[in-house]
């Protein structure tokens, strides 16, 4: 039987506000760019082109994938590349640094499912450039791949 304390704790957890894209300025687009000083960043852009956020990247980025329900984005390295950074766009915090499996590279793009439970980054095998969609779960662990034939 559930105790009153456990019930109230669960109720508070469910009722607590969750971060949303509004917390990150409700960007319309994500874009990777080089700044005037030569640094690279992922930008959130409003409909009028104004920056809603700017998050630094360690090297040249190519594209970003926005999580459909949380203010998170994955910034992918320029193809072929070795980084995909999961960023909290509301706080600027690095959530996770994704590393492709041994012998694989990220290929600049990715997308979440509509529910946000799976991330599909475009990957390629370094030795022969054979293409794959990686399959990464909600904890950003790689759980599989699909060969693309490319």
Q: Each predicted region: which residue ranges?
A:
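Repeated scaffold domains used in trafficking and secretory/extracellular systems
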Residues: 59-66, 105-109, 150
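Short loop/turn segments that connect beta-strands within beta-propeller blades
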Residues: 46-48, 89-91, 137-139
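Short, solvent-exposed loop/turn segments at conserved positions within beta-propeller repeat blades
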Residues: 35-38, 78-80, 126-130
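C-terminal segment of N-terminal export signals and the immediately downstream linker at the start
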Residues: 18-45
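A short beta-strand motif characteristic of beta-propeller blades
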Residues: 50-56, 93-100, 142-147
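N-terminal export signals
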Residues: 1-23
């Amino acid at each position: 039987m559930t105790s009153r304390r456990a019930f109230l704790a669960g109720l508070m957890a469910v009722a607590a506000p969750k971060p949303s894209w509004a917390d990150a300025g409700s960007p319309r687009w994500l874009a990777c760019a080089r700044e005037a000083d030569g640094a690279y960043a992922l930008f959130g852009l409003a409909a009028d082109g104004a920056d809603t956020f700017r998050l630094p990247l360690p090297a040249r980025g190519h594209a970003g994938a926005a999580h459909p329900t949380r203010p998170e984005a994955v910034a992918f390295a320029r193809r072929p590349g070795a980084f995909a950074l999961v960023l909290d766009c509301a706080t600027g915090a690095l959530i996770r640094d994704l590393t492709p499996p041994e012998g694989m590279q990220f290929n600049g793009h990715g997308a979440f499912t509509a529910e946000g439970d799976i991330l599909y980054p475009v990957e390629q095998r370094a030795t022969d450039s054979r293409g794959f969609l990686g399959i990464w779960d909600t904890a950003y662990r790689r759980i599989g791949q699909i060969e693309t034939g490319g």
